[in-house]
């Protein structure tokens, strides 16, 4: 989430239970917001354990291996979304603290179970309305559509997040800041997010009576569907009761087809993040009339002049059964290459967050730039773009430069030498490929 520095240990038992919101007030109550652990960061190991388990079970049970290109794109979006947290405390908590410090009306006790449970309900209620508006207000959808852009539905999809979305969500939690201490809010805003990880799976079917109260994989599959019956439904975070109360609940019926109604057809991370912002910009200037221009921003993504606020249901593309996910086939060695370099990138990413307080601004900026370049280059490779080889050559050269001048460091013995050898080989291989492709393009022009 960014900005949490609490050093409280999270046991293995607590780590597992926090993924399902099964923790007790007496073990997750803190007097000061600075004492609240960064539960999301501590959950990283559990994310990957659950991801690996899902991959194994899905492959062994259903014969459905993970699509590496789509899965890595989702993980890339998760990395992308957290980069602003290197420099800034999470805007949700920072804005909450400001209101609490300046405008609170009463101060509920931070160590009361009643405060804990009230905050649980308040955060989940705020999330429901934020999530609903993120689908019903076009400018907010620009931040949320990233999460819906995957055409697969698995645990990697849960990590496909937008770096823009957090700048809209904070206002929906403001009312609690008039009475609920920031430390209690900071706990629940993290647990609410963590709970939503495990429901992104096709491996769990109906959960019986729990389906009436909790948001479950079945309910959330509907939310991610692009079938007409799935659109604008099941906004719950933890409790599905809000959808039942406000008329947005839809049960799972026919097989769900996942993704956007108009697929983006790319694995390039910047397009995954901002393609709808570009669409809004172009539509804004192409739409006549000032009031219509405002409607482009503040009405639904499906709105157009003369249409209802949320657009016309009949314009939602029907499912024919012939739909195929965007999937340019990559050779097995390229998929292994992508996974290997993403794991190497994660080491850079994790170290940057751990050492952000002692790294110089120049080092932080260079590492952020390298991370974004790596994510982009992997996207180019999986998209099979013409300049992929050239971009990957530049990326590998940049890594060697950064390591040589100590902008990339490691505490692991011999890893520096291994990196130097690996990236030198990659530079040569991709460089040769880039030269060969350039020669072939030149011949075609002659």
From Swiss-Prot:
Transmembrane portions of the chain: 43-63, 110-130, 167-187, 339-359, 362-382, 412-434
Domain Fatty acid hydroxylase positions: 118-248
InterPro entries, alphabetized: AGMP_C (IPR056853), Fatty_acid_hydroxylase (IPR006694), Sterol_desaturase/TMEM195 (IPR051689)
Short sequence motif Histidine box-3: positions: 220-224
Substrates-to-products reaction catalysed: 1-O-(1,2-saturated-alkyl)-sn-glycerol + (6R)-L-erythro-5,6,7,8-tetrahydrobiopterin + O2 = a 1-(1-hydroxyalkyl)-sn-glycerol + (6R)-L-erythro-6,7-dihydrobiopterin + H2O
Protein's GO biological process: ether lipid metabolic process; lipid biosynthetic process; membrane lipid metabolic process
Highest taxon, organism lineage: Eukaryota
Subcellular location, record wording: Endoplasmic reticulum membrane
Major location (coarse): endoplasmic reticulum
A family per Pfam: AGMP_C
Residue numbers covered by motif Histidine box-1: 131-135
Membrane topology recorded in Swiss-Prot or TrEMBL: Multi-pass membrane protein
EC identifiers of the protein: 1.14.16.5
Function: Glyceryl-ether monooxygenase that cleaves the O-alkyl bond of ether lipids. Ether lipids are essential components of brain membranes.
Protein family (similarity comment): Belongs to the sterol desaturase family. TMEM195 subfamily.
Record's protein name: Alkylglycerol monooxygenase
Organism: Xenopus tropicalis (Western clawed frog)
Gene: agmo
């Amino acid at each position: 989430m960014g900005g949490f520095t609490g050093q409280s240990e999270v046991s293995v038992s607590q780590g597992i239970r926090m993924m399902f919101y099964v923790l007790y007030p007496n073990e997750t109550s803190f007097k000061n917001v600075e004492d609240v652990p960064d539960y999301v960061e501590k959950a990283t190991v559990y994310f990957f354990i659950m991801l690996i388990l899902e991959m194994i079970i899905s492959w062994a049970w259903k014969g459905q291996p993970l699509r590496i290109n789509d899965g890595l794109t989702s993980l890339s979006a998760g990395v992308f979304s957290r980069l602003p947290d290197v420099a800034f405390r999470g805007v949700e908590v920072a804005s909450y603290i400001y209101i609490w410090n300046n405008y609170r009306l009463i101060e509920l006790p931070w160590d009361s179970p009643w405060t804990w449970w009230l905050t649980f309900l308040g955060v989940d209620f705020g999330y429901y309305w934020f999530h609903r508006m993120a689908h019903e207000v076009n400018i907010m959808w620009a931040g949320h559509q990233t999460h819906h852009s995957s055409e697969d539905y698995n645990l990697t999809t849960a990590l496909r997040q937008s770096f823009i979305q957090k700048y809209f969500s904070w206002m929906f939690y403001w009312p609690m800041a008039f009475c609920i201490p920031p430390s209690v809010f900071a706990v629940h805003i993290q647990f609410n997010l963590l709970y939503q990880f495990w429901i992104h799976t096709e491996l769990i079917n109906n959960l019986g009576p729990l389906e009436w109260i909790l948001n479950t994989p079945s309910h959330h599959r509907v939310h991610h569907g692009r079938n007409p019956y799935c659109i604008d439904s099941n906004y719950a975070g933890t409790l599905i009761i809000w959808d039942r109360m406000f008329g947005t609940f839809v049960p799972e019926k026919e097989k769900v087809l996942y993704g956007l109604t108009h697929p983006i057809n790319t694995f390039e991370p910047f397009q995954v993040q901002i393609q709808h912002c570009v669409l809004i910009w172009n539509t804004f200037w192409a739409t006549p009339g000032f009031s219509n221009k405002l409607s482009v921003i503040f009405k639904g993504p499906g709105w157009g002049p003369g249409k209802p606020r949320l657009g016309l249901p009949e314009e939602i593309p029907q499912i024919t059964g012939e739909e195929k996910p965007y999937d340019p086939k990559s050779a097995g060695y390229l998929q292994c290459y992508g996974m290997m370099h993403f794991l190497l990138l994660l080491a850079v990413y994790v170290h940057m967050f751990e050492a952000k307080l002692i790294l110089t601004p120049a080092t932080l900026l260079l590492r952020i730039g390298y991370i974004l370049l790596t994510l982009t280059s992997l996207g180019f490779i999986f998209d099979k773009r013409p300049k992929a080889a050239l971009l990957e050559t530049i990326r590998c050269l940049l890594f060697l430069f950064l390591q040589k001048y100590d902008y990339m460091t490691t505490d692991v013995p011999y890893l520096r030498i291994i990196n130097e050898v690996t990236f030198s080989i990659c530079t040569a291989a991709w460089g040769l490929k880039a030269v060969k492709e350039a020669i072939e393009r030149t011949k075609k022009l002659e």
